[in-house]
Amino acid sequence: MEGVIDFDNLERPILLQFYADWCAPCKMLSGVLDHIEGDIRENVDFVRVNIDHDRELKDEFFVRSVPTMILLNKRGDIYWRQTGVVPPQEIMKHVHQVE
């Protein structure tokens, strides 16, 4: 992940996608997210986190399996957390509801 994110001082909600290059379900989820990324970015910031390169962030959010998505509200609190592949409608529902 590039740059540093101050999770206690977010300007917008943020969706974190934790993945690994060797993970087949991660590739499936990435395809889903690629399809809806434009819609996601209208409402929240979107960051992909490779767990093999950013172990500190993986540990900070207690990510134990991938793919995992974590949606944080503007206060930096976890609003929604999902492990595994989910349909785009489920992702967008939460992206539209978070503040």
Listing of model-derived features with the role each one plays in the protein:
Residues 15-16, 46, 69:
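Hydrophobic beta-strand anchors of alpha/beta hydrolase catalytic cores
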Residues 1-13:
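A short beta-strand-turn-helix
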Residues 23-26, 69:
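The canonical Cys-X-X-Cys-His
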Residues 65, 70-99:
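Non-catalytic, surface beta->alpha helical segment in thiol-disulfide oxidoreductase systems
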Residues 60-64:
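A short glycine-leucine-enriched loop at secondary-structure breakpoints
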